[in-house]
Amino acid sequence: MRILGINISHHSSSCLLKDGEIEWFMEEARLAKDKHHHIEYFNGGFYGSKLLKDIDHIDHVIFTSFCSKWHDWRRIACCLQAITSQGCSFGEVIFDPYEHHLYHAHNAFYASGFDQAIALVMDGSGALYKPMVDIEGGFYRESESVYHCEYPDRILPKERHYSAYEQAAIEPVTEGINTLSNTFPAALIFSRVCESFGFGARGADAGKVMGMYAYGKPDVYKNPWYIKSKTGHWITDNTVMYDDMLPFFDGERDFQKQANIAYKLQEETKKYTMSKLHDIIDKYNPKNIVLSGGYFMNCV
């Protein structure tokens, strides 16, 4: 049995399994000769299909994404067309756009070697909040999630935080295990700082900002970027944060000032992350903790 997994999000990639063994794994950028290539219906599509020219049939094709509200199904159609163009047929097609953080938790847990762990996922832009996906302006996305993981296949969601990224902070609203707020995820703050400096977005250039941290000075930007809400949640003070970044969005390029912002960014997100980890330890007393998502992969 062959299973083809395709990531149609940014930094696209694909992996072909045959009877549970990896036949190949390929990043699209290597085939497209474009460092930041991602699968689109207008830019050459799915380059990984070229590796299928000697394969007659795939039993299951499974897609993952961060849930693009309009474009995912177009990308999927593009990939399927590319597969058949190589003379390869396929059976079941699977795509669940609402479990982006579950995939991150799987990656962290099954690569860890642990038999049990709590997975903390911190991401810039996860799946959309399903109950509001069809509402105009309903752009709440996963930013943080907590899962209980046990071998062989027990992974249960314990907490989900969805963020809307509005300018003004609001009091978080909790619905079961779901919390909705207008706080900025730590990973997205990195992305916003990258953009304000004129770097690439989506965490691609987070390493540059981290390097600038070493040259930054403490206590230049004194107002905290995180505040504690009345509900006890730590949320970003978006007005303060954007006021600090605004000169750079307006084009100011002063290395020392940028380094000072990088210092502020690193310290603020570090303090927040540590508070989140202490909260997990207090609530769940886990034997192990695994970390995943764009923040931990790109920004830490």
Question: Residue spans of the language-model regions?
Answer:
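Short acidic/glycine-rich loops and adjacent helix/strand connectors
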Residues: M1-V300
